[in-house]
Each structure stands twice: as C-alpha cells, then as structure tokens.
Amino acid sequence: MSTQSRKSNSSKQPHSTHKKLDPELKFKLETLTELFPDWTNDDLIDLVQEYEDLETIIDKITSGAATKWDEVKKPSKKERQREQQQQQQQQQQAQLAAQQATQPSSQSHHNNHTHISPSHDGDHSHSAQTSHNHHQSKSSKFSSRERDSSSRSHKKSSNNAAASGPNGSGNARRERASGASRVPATSAASAASANASAVQPDHLKTAVSAAKTASSTSWAAMASDKKAAKQSAQAKKAEEQQQEQQSPQQAQHESTAPSPQQEAEPQSQSQSKSQPQSDNKSAESVSSTSTPATEDLEKPKKMTWAAIVKPKTKPSVKKSEPLEELEDLKREAAQISTEEPEAAEKVIEQVIEQVEQTPEEVVEQVEVTVVPEEVSQESEEASAQQEETAEPAAPVVPAEPEAASSEEKAAPAQPEQGTYSPVAQQQQPQQQQQPQQQQQAQQQQQQPTAYSEDKQSQAQQAQSQQAQSFYQAQPQQYGSQTPQQTPQTLQQQNAAAAAAAAQQQYYMYQNQFPGYSYPGMFDSQSYPAGYGQQYAPQSQNGSQPQTASTQQSQSGQYGVPPGYASTGRDLGAASPMAAQVQLQQQQQQQPYGGSFMPYYHFYQQSFPYGQPQYGMAGQYPYQVPKAYNYMNQYQPQQGGQTPSSQSQQGEEAQQSAQQGQATASQGQAQGSGSQGQAQTNAQQQAQLQQYYQFQQQQQQQQAAAAAAAAQQGGVPYGYSGYDFSSQATRGFY
C-alpha cells in the first residue's frame, strides 16, 4: 500500500514538472487546454486532480463554479509554499494545544513552535481537526518513510511543502483554496505515528479555546517576520473561507458550506474522496464522527475583493402589508384633523379681512374709469363679488368650527350684498348669452349668505370657480357690447369643442403613428377616410345631398381633404356593388369590410383580435384606388390644387364645423358643398391618378434597390430599407 501511495505521491510532485503526470491526467489536461485556452495549466491541474470526471470539470468551468487563481490573487509559488507550511504548523499547534492533556508525545515534537499565541487557536480548530483526521488515516502508512524526513522538513520547508500530502501539491493548492490546509504530512505523520491507533478518538475532540479575531496583515508583509507571517496566514485563511462562501462551487474538495461550523465535516469527507487510495474508509469513518467546533461562530468575516465584487444576493425585502399602510394613513389623517380646526379658523379670518378690503379697492378703481365703460365696471364688480363669495367657502372646515364661523362669514357678506345686488340683477340679462358654468357662478353671486350654511361646497370647487368667474367676467364685456355676435361665438366654441373631442377620440384608437395599421383597423364603423362616405353620422331618412355635406363635414374635421370623400362616393355610385354595400351599411352594421367573405363573420365574433388583412384589395374590393385609405395621412392637402378649390375647401370645413350644432346653417353648407364638388371632382381624380402612378414608380425603384442591397448581403433577409412614406413597406413593421 505504502509503495502505491508513494508512487502516486511522486507522480504528482510540483506542478512545474509536467513530465511526471500520468498519461490519463495529461490527456485530460490537453483536452481542457484546448477547450479553455485562457486557463493556465496550473489551474487546470488543480481541477483535474480535484474532480476525476472530465465532464464535471468542464461543467464547473463553464458554469463559473471553479475559479482561476489569478481571479483572486495568485501568491507566488514560494510564498504560497511558505504560507502553507506556516499555516499547517500553526494548525497543528492549535490542535496540540487543545490536546495537550491527552497527547504529551506529540507535543514534544512541536515544542519548537509553541511560541504561537493561543489567541489563534480557535481560528484554526476546524481545519486543524480535519487535517488531523485526514492524516491520521495515512500516518501509519507513511510513518516509516516520513520519520526520517521530519528533521529535514523544517529547514527545507519551502521545497517540501509541495510534496506534503499523498496528493502532493495538488492538495496543497486546493488547501489554499479551501482554507483548511492540512498539516504537512511529514510533520503531522511523524507526530501522530507514535500514537496512531491509540490516540485516534482524542483527535476528534473539538477545540476548547474561544475564537479571537485574527489580525489581518497583508500578504505582502508575509515574508518579513515570522509572527506577522503566521497572523497573515490566518487572515488569508479567513479570507479564503469567506471566498468559498461566495463561491461554494470550489468543488467537492472545497465543498465548504457557507457557515463556518459546517466546514469541518464536508471538508474532511471531500478530502477523503479526492484520494482514491484505499484509506477512504478510515478517513470517512473519522470524518463522520468529527463534530464542528461551535466557537467558530464568532469568527470574523474577511472579505476578499473577489467576494466584494460578486453581487450580493439581496435578502428579499418584505413588502409592507397594505393594511399597515392603511393604518399609517389613518393615523396621519387623525393628526391632521386635530390640527385642522385651528388652522381653518385662522384662514377664515384672513379671508374675511381680504374680502373686506377688496370691494373698496375695486370700487375706487371703478370710479376712476369713465362712464362709457360701464360694462367693464360691471364685470369687474361682478368678479369682485364672486371673489368674495367664493373665498369664504375656500377652507374646508370640520363641522364644529363651521357653525362658529358661519356667523362671522354671514356678517360681512350681508351688507356687501346690499350694495352689489343691483349690479347682479343688471347682469341677469347678459347671463342668457353666457355659457352655463358662468351662469352658475353668477347665481351663486346672488346668494352669498347661503354659502356659510352650504357645507358641501368644497374648497377646490370654490377656488376654481373664483378663477373661472374672474376670467369669464372679461368676455362678458364684449358679449354685452355686441349682442349680435354672441350666437356665433357660442356656436364656434361649441363646434370647436366638438371637433376637438372627435379628433382626440380619433387619435386615441386609430392611427397613433402614420403608417401604422393593424389587421382589423378599417372594419370599424368609425374609420373616416377609407369609408368616410358611408359612415357619416346621419339621420336615417336623410336625402342624398345631405349625406354629401355631412360627409364633407366629417372628413373636414379629420383633416381629410374634403374632395376625397366625395370621390369615394362617386366611385361608389358608379359601381352597383358598392352602392348596394352602402345601403346595407346605412341600415345595419356590416362586420367585415363590405367585401363578400362568407365565413368571415364567425371569425370576427370568435376572435378578440382583428382579422388577417389580405392586402387592401382583398378586404375592400370595391375601393378602386389602391392605397385609398392612406391618402389623408400622407397628403392631407394636395399641393397642386387651384386656389379656388382650396378656398372652397376652407369654406366647407368651416361650415361643417358649425353644421352639426347649428341646424339653421345646414342648408347653406349643403348648397356650397354640392356646388364646389362638381368642379373639384375631375381635378382631384386626375391628381389621384398621378399620385398612384408616382407611388408605383417609387415602389419599383425601392424594390430594385432592395434587391441590389440583398445581393451585397448588407441587409438582413426580408428587410428592404424601411421608408415611412412608402406604401411598400408600410404594412409590415
């Protein structure tokens, strides 16, 4: 047995000599160097010695479980060996100190090292233990050979360390990583061999001394003096343990689990695994009985930079329960409500003072102005009043203070009302012309006293009203001066509002982006350009001319050059199919785009998403011009139109805006609308013709260009340079 282990030992002598590696190892190494050229031979040798199986090694490397040395910081060879020996001796001493009572014999051998301060004992108790267990199993085999070398071992420590264990430097390397380096076999075995069989149980005792913090000297200082060296060895060991905790990958060998107490057992087991010699059984039996030393709980955690760089796994933050948040809110609310009454009362007082000041100022200003500006005076006074009435309502007051303050408020308000009420009545006729909001504001003017009891009037409402009424008082002047204008302005406002609403709604769904279309896009009733003519919102009994102008109105709002809708209608009239479709669509909503697709109906009902588009032509066979639906977006107003037609369009648009609201102006709109159309139609059709020819030309050019590009190989498959304004690419991106 000893010969065999000796052979394997020598075969794994220092890494620098690769000549002695057995062929199997060599083969593995070659394979690995081919696969991972950036790994140094040393690192690979370590791995190969650690895991027999090539697959596991490859797996470890690819998954990042095994790390290279330079990623941490590779101490130079000599330094490493020196460190190792120091560490090992230290560990032995640590253990020996713990076992002094039971093992006088082994003590004698190491007297020369006893100067190590006991403070470090706890630190190494695990590793020492495991290493002893580990060596214990071999000591009998090695004892004869190694007793002679023990005397040499301390002098030539640096050379010898490489050959220390049965696995030689492979182990040494790994020990460095695992932070639990074994005692050099030479010294350990010679020490232990005397009482190999007798002492075995004693070796399993846990260390007794408490752990103390290891001082952290940098590795650079290692060589300088011995004590520093020993301490730094410890520091390094602690760091390495930490490092393993960051990467527990370091293989079975370093399979140290994150918390130090668990280290002892897995290490001793994994070490025994890594020696395929027959001493496995004994080593394992030892390791199974060994118990972790509890003192190491207090071991300080050293961080390597590698550990620091590694992103920490964040402890999952417990989200605060919504209930708790609710309770916090309630608490805050309670606090606020207690503070509020006083604050509210203060505010009320301030407001009342302001109210008392403002009317006088306003009146002074007003008196300065000349009589012809009565109207503006009225409006100013009105606004002053509104301010008064609105302000007292501003603070939202809890019920109790309200009662108290209501008298305060009522008092100033009443006399003022007396002075201003005539003005308010004067304004009454004007109210008819004003929009509703203002009416409300003025009505509230008439009952200032009511405010104090009115608990529902919220602060915000009051303030916003104040602002509104203040600004709206201005338009009032003009309204009263030129009464004949009001109906028109009102109408314009309404029309504009309606148009804006329609516009907004339109953009909300249909084409947010030019050139964007989705499959079901045009089957909805509301899409104005493609189908503008059929979908105009008209009364069912409407005559044909009326349809025309309504269409005009709708397309006008959406910025479709109004001629187009009519073009569509004329085409429709020309083809019987389209006319029929149009009729149907006015009676009952047709789900699919007017074309005859017999089973489409069912799809549309059973699928939540739009239907496939077989190209525009497939869906809208009766829509003759090819890209009809896109026209409006791309050329909203044709540039080439004659000025007359343009002005006519402008007219139409304006009329259409009013048309929905003011029934009176409808006849007019229809008249001019139908007049202008006749002229424009021919023109516009000609233009359309040109436009489509031009587009086709462009498409051909583009296709040619794309083909050329594809041959050069510069363009990904299926992609022809995407041009937003071209029809060709539009449906696809």
Swiss-Prot record:
Post-translational modification comment from the UniProt entry: Ubiquitinated. Proteolytically cleaved by the proteasome in response to transcription stress; the resulting N-terminal form constitutes the activated nuclear form and the C-terminal portion is degraded.
- According to the entry, every stretch annotated as the CUE domain falls at 24-66
- Cell compartment(s), UniProt: Cytoplasm; Nucleus; Chromosome, Telomere
- Report biased composition (Basic and acidic residues) as residue ranges: 68-83, 318-333
Domain of life, source organism: Eukaryota
- Using the UniProt annotation, give all residue ranges assigned to the region (Disordered): 1-24, 61-343, 366-497, 518-590, 633-682
Keyword annotations for this protein?
Chromosome, Cytoplasm, DNA damage, DNA repair, DNA-binding, Nucleus, Telomere, Ubl conjugation, Ubl conjugation pathway
Low complexity: bias regions = 84-103, 158-171, 180-198, 206-223, 243-278, 382-404, 424-448, 457-497, 542-557, 580-590
List where Polar residues composition bias occurs.
1-14, 104-117, 279-293
One GO term describing the cellular component: nucleus
| Sequence similarity | Belongs to the DEF1 family.
State whether it acts alone or in a complex, and with which partners, per the record: Homodimer; may form higher order oligomers. Interacts with the large RNA polymerase II subunit RPO21; the interaction is direct and serves to bridge RPO21 to the Elongin complex in a manner dependent on transcription stress. Interacts with RAD26.
The job of this chain, per UniProt, is described as: Recruits the ubiquitination machinery to RNA polymerase II for polyubiquitination, removal and degradation, when the transcription-coupled repair (TCR) factor RAD26 fails to efficiently displace stalled RNA polymerase II. Also involved in telomere length regulation. Binds DNA.
Stated name of the protein: RNA polymerase II degradation factor 1
* Source species of the chain: Lachancea thermotolerans (strain ATCC 56472 / CBS 6340 / NRRL Y-8284)
